[in-house]
Amino acid sequence: MDGAEQTPGGGVMQNARHPKTHRELCELACRFLRNNGFKVVFSDRFHAWTSCGEHPDALGFRNGASCLIEVKCSRSDFLADRKKVFRSEPEKGMGDWRFYLCEPGVITVADLPAGWGLLYAINGRVRKVHGWPGNHQWVVTVAKPFRANKQAECDYLFSALRRLEIRGVTENGADADRVQTYGL
């Protein structure tokens, strides 16, 4: 954990406000992805069929890379996550890069499965605790900690595009703000 997450006395910083809900943390994760170069982002409100059964809390795409953020509000939720098939068999999961987002104290770097990164939500902002790559590393194949299930990602994207077509989103993008705001 870097110094930004510790108090001068060595304790862990806590949020000044009440703990965030799962929905609030998912929205924070999506904003964070958009602010970090992921121009196509889906929140947990978007439900799509995938071949692996995974329903990401936040999934972002940029040229050459995908990033999954899994939100955890409690330690028990984090521990239960390990039982999911796409966690025990990472090749079945989505995201070339995968991160947990939680409030400080729920998950530590020592708790992370191999290849996973950690982000903390502190006072409405996301702090990069472990594993967030530099801008040039996103597309370097050997730097990617996971080989994402590209079929599942394509299923997910197809479902999104199909919904746009069904809803009649205009070619000139006039409805783009509505789509981004409401998660399709």
Predicted regions: what is each one?
Residues 2-35, 110-184:
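Non-catalytic C-terminal interaction segments of nucleic acid-processing enzymes
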Residues 43-44, 101-103, 121-123, 129:
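Conserved beta-strand termini and adjacent loop/short-helix elements that scaffold enzyme active sites
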Residues 56-68:
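Active-site beta-strand-loop-beta-strand hairpin of nuclease catalytic cores
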Residues 66, 72-121:
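Catalytic cores of nucleic-acid endonucleases
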Residues 46, 59, 72:
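Anionic group-transfer/hydrolysis microenvironments
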Residues 34-51:
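A short acidic/basic microdomain associated with nuclease active sites
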Residues 52-53, 75:
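A short, well-structured beta->alpha microelement
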